[in-house]
Amino acid sequence: MARTFILWLHGLGDSGPANEPIQTQFKSSELSNASWLFPSAPFNPVTCNNGAVMRSWFDVPELPFKVGSPIDESSVLEAVKNVHAIIDQEIAEGTNPENVFICGLSQGGALTLASVLLYPKTLGGGAVLSGWVPFTSSIISQFPEEAKKTPILWSHGTDDRMVLFEAGQAALPFLKEAGVTCEFKAYPGLGHSISNKELKYIESWIKRRLKGSSSTCLQLNCLKEMFH
């Protein structure tokens, strides 16, 4: 049976274990035995919070994040290396790359986008929830051709005051320039959070993209901590 792997990347200051209940919202039989991983970011000083130390995948110079907010690309690229190591391990264990899905909220969404677009193989998809583009367009030339074939699902609440809706919309011209397919879904009235409606759509989106058997095998019950 085909194996499916779902990697979920949390937001700034959050943790992997706190996000594990999300898995229970995915109730379809096609994903009943999917392998999930909810890693926790390391503790780092964060510029937008006056240098306070918290779980953070990379440095964030400014929040709320809006169109034109400064970014720290070098910090993002370091975080991407660690996500790629997890994906590499999963593929080495036999998972079809096109059954590997990366999902992330806020800062985790930005890291999801970066990790997918810089990975040398086509993955099943990247789901960005209330995230942003953590790059300037100068990096587009570094995207592998296979990575550009990975579909992106972008979900964003119109009332988001932490990562402004307009910052999410700015992903569309960026991805178009890169030649990447993106489905953008706006959620009217939703702030900087996740809704059950979003999760249900992500579930159906993943199901439509599964390769091979509709069933999955390999259950990972352990939680791995990244970057330690």
From Swiss-Prot:
This is Carboxylesterase SOBER1. Coiled coil: none annotated. Disruption phenotype: No visible phenotype under normal growth conditions, but mutant plants show hypersensitive response to infection with the bacterial pathogen Xanthomonas campestris pv. vesicatoria containing the type III effector protein AvrBsT. The keyword Lipid biosynthesis does not apply. The keyword Lipid metabolism applies. One of its GO terms (biological process) is phosphatidic acid biosynthetic process. Belongs to the AB hydrolase superfamily. AB hydrolase 2 family. The active site is at residues 106, 160, 192. Keywords: Fatty acid metabolism, Hydrolase, Lipid metabolism, Plant defense. It holds the Pfam family Abhydrolase_2. It comes from the Eukaryota. GO terms for molecular function: carboxylic ester hydrolase activity; phospholipase A2 activity; short-chain carboxylesterase activity. Its EC number is 3.1.1.-. SUPFAM superfamilies: alpha/beta-Hydrolases (SSF53474). Possesses carboxylesterase activity in vitro with a preference for short acyl chain substrates. Functions as a negative regulator of the hypersensitive response (HR) triggered by the bacterial type III effector protein AvrBsT. Possesses phospholipase A2 (PLA2) activity and hydrolyzes phosphatidylcholine (PC), a lipid that is hydrolyzed by phospholipase D (PLD) to produce phosphatidic acid (PA). Required to suppress AvrBsT-dependent HR and PLD-dependent production of PA in response to AvrBsT elicitation.
